């Protein structure tokens, strides 16, 4: 998929998300890992494709966790047994000089209630070389487990700015040498006005659908 080619791998790659500056600044806080581990939550309200998971990986690198010391946990298939194993694994140091390890719990809202309760216990006693980063498109996922939501340092992702996405897509089209039909406007495409239904300002979706949108727009122009 084309969006994989343009997945953000550094801070400057993110588009239309002011919260990235907040996360970047937080990575420089002097008290991080001072006596206990870190638990950060990258959340949005029903907004997918806005960079949360990519930001989790960039954050892990910024905090000194190597690729081999960063582990993704799929919350859809996560079980109590998996979390028990994780609790033991966390006490092993990473391969970097600081020994840090990052655990990214993707789409954390899919954890079952029993797993959420166990996660609460894990977060309360994280080893000081560990950061757990949760990503979620829900802001009420932890309502049934008292105290779980408040355990996180939270960063809210918003719906990306349409003009910024349009500029980003135009740059991508230029890099790929895509033909831009006369009359095609990137801002109209982002707004879903070019014959392709997009999922809000979902950057991933906008990138993946772009080549087909350009071809269809060109075909319609010829037919007219």
Residue ranges and their predicted role:
Residues 1-45, 88-96:
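Pre-Walker A (pre-P-loop) alpha-helix and adjacent loop at the N terminus of AAA/AAA+ ATPase modules
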Residues 18-21, 68-102, 113:
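Short glycine-rich substrate-engagement loop in P-loop NTPases that contacts/grips substrate
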Residues 28-72, 124:
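Walker A/P-loop
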Residues 38, 95-103, 116-118, 126-133:
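Loop/turn-to-beta-strand initiation segments
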Residues 43-49, 184-205:
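A short helix-loop-helix "switch/interaction" segment in the helical subdomain of ASCE P-loop NTPases
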Residues 45, 74-77, 153-166:
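Conserved AAA+ ATPase "SRH/arginine-finger" region at the nucleotide-binding site
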Residues 89, 150-151, 155, 164-179, ...:
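Conserved AAA+ ATPase "sensor/coupling" helix adjacent to the nucleotide-binding pocket
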Residues 120-124, 139-153:
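Short regulatory helix/loop adjacent to the ATP-binding pocket of P-loop NTPases
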């Amino acid at each position: 998929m084309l969006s994989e080619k343009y997945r953000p791998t550094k801070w400057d790659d993110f588009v239309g998300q002011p919260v990235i500056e907040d996360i970047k600044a937080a990575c420089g806080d002097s008290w991080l890992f001072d006596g206990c581990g870190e638990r950060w939550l990258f959340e949005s309200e029903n907004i997918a494709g806005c960079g949360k998971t990519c930001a989790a990986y960039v954050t892990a690198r910024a905090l000194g966790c190597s690729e081999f010391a960063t582990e993704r946990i799929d919350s859809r298939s996560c079980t109590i047994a998996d979390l028990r194993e994780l609790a033991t694994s966390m006490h092993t140091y990473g391969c970097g000089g600081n020994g840090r390890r990052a655990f990214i719990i993707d789409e954390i809202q899919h954890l079952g209630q029993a797993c959420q309760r166990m996660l609460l216990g894990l977060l309360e006693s994280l080893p000081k070389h560990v950061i757990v980063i949760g990503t979620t498109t829900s802001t009420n996922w932890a309502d049934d487990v008292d105290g779980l939501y408040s355990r996180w340092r939270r960063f809210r992702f918003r719906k990306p700015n349409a003009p910024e996405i349009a500029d980003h897509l135009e740059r991508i089209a230029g890099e790929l040498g895509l033909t831009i039909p006369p009359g095609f406007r990137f801002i109209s495409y982002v707004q879903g006005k070019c014959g392709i239904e997009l999922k809000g300002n979902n950057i991933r979706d906008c990138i993946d659908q772009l080549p087909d949108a350009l071809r269809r727009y060109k075909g319609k122009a010829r037919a007219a």
